């Protein structure tokens, strides 16, 4: 028998197969760099001329970025629509204040909306940088930064094995 949840997934014959989002920050940590690649697959027998668009909405539902492209999608072939933009003054994501934007991707065939896919996006930048401060061995410390701010990891180093007998 079936022991876990089951659901049916249905998509149009020409639909989003996959997408990739890169949402980071520039060197000032104030301007968002947004890149989106949408892969489409056409399972129909004839080519389609589709309009692919995205809209990035803030927490109040206001569009901060939007763009659309026409794309000719051949049968049985993956086609990719790529978008890239800079967004000044974005609200950054941190663990303490996890600001997220709602991205809505839309596929249209003429005036008919074929598919709408929502996704949440946060703008943040992770880095490892060396400091000017030197450790006891004379090498500089390396610091983990989120949006240019140092993050201190607190924890322990656990090794669940015994050097003489293997696992405990």
Q: Which residues make up each language-model segment?
A:
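Secreted/periplasmic carbohydrate-active enzymes, especially glycoside hydrolases
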Residues: 1-168
């Amino acid at each position: 028998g079936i022991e876990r949840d089951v659901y049916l997934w249905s998509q149009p014959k020409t639909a989003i197969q996959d997408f990739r989002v890169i949402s980071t920050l520039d060197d000032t940590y104030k301007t968002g760099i947004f890149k989106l690649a949408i892969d489409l697959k056409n399972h129909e027998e004839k080519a389609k001329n589709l309009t692919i668009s995205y809209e990035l909405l803030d927490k109040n539902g206001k569009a901060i970025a939007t763009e659309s492209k026409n794309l000719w999608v051949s049968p049985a072939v993956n086609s990719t629509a790529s978008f890239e933009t800079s967004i000044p003054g974005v609200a950054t994501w941190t663990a303490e204040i996890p600001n997220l934007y709602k991205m809505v991707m839309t596929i249209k065939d003429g005036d008919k909306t074929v598919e709408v896919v929502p996704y949440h996006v946060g703008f943040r930048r992770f880095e490892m940088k060396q400091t000017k401060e030197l450790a006891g061995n004379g090498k500089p410390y390396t610091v983990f930064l989120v949006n240019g701010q140092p993050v201190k990891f607190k924890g322990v180093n656990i090794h669940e094995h015994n050097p003489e007998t293997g696992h405990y």
